[in-house]
Amino acid sequence: MTNYREIAWQGLWKNNPGLVQLLGLCPLLAVTATITNALGLGLATMLVLIGSNILVSLVRDYVPKEIRIPVFVMIIAALVTTVQLLINAYAYGLYLSLGIFLPLIVTNCIIIGRAEAFASRNNAFSAAFDGLMMGLGFTLVLTVLGATREILGQGTLFDGADQLLGPWAKSLTIHLWQVDTPFLLAMLPPGAFIVMGLLIALKNVIDKKVKERQPQVAAEPSVTRARITKVG
């Protein structure tokens, strides 16, 4: 029986693809200059994850093991192309902002990794839930990273939200303080590396504190085996 709580825990925290597995670092560090770009890439990745997991789970019994990886990649590429065309049609500004990193979702190790490790061994519903949780965990990391970099670099939040949600979303932009010159270190990839390292360190500290608060399980006493030789 599938443990959905464990799947959610793995995707959102314990085995988070961004903070623990460190997968998809290239787009994660390059595109997250603003929270809008981070959300756009995260949602696109999550849609592809869910769709690829479902399709891989449905065809797993019909694909020979020898050619499963090329078949999985073709499925992922078809889904990425579909998502790319949808973003191009309905969120053209976001499409331009994400650039080459949108089609590069095909090569994202998170997607092919979940297809091989989970979707190819479980039913469609469980695979879809795994894709949702892994995608949501990745999107949360992207969002926190993008929000932190945008605040430090521009002093704003949700700048350019109209690219993702439409013209009405211009009113969502929050100006936290006036910035005459953007803080380039936060806006460029080196700043993303630093913020990402701090997020990983924060997660490790939280895990350590939680582990210390858990009751210690007493170790079982060791049993010493003695060999008795009967004499006489």
Swiss-Prot record:
The keyword Methyltransferase is annotated on this UniProt entry: no
InterPro entries: NqrDE/RnfAE (IPR003667), RnfE (IPR010968)
The EC number(s) this enzyme carries: 7.-.-.-
GO BP annotations, alphabetical order: electron transport chain
Name of one Pfam family that matches: Rnf-Nqr
Keywords noted in UniProt: Cell inner membrane, Cell membrane, Electron transport, Membrane, Translocase, Transmembrane, Transmembrane helix, Transport
This protein's GO CC annotations: plasma membrane
Top-level class of the enzyme under EC nomenclature: translocase
Main location as per UniProt: membrane
Keyword match Transmembrane: yes
Transmembrane portions of the chain: 18-38, 39-59, 69-89, 93-113, 127-147, 182-202
Location within or outside the cell: Cell inner membrane
Membrane protein topology class: Multi-pass membrane protein
Coiled coil: none
Domain of life: Bacteria
Family: Belongs to the NqrDE/RnfAE family.
NCBIfam families: PRK12405.1 (NF009070), rnfE (TIGR01948)
Subunit structure: The complex is composed of six subunits: RnfA, RnfB, RnfC, RnfD, RnfE and RnfG.
UniProt function note: Part of a membrane-bound complex that couples electron transfer with translocation of ions across the membrane.
Name this protein carries in UniProt: Ion-translocating oxidoreductase complex subunit E
Species annotation: Shewanella baltica (strain OS185)
Gene name in the database record: rnfE
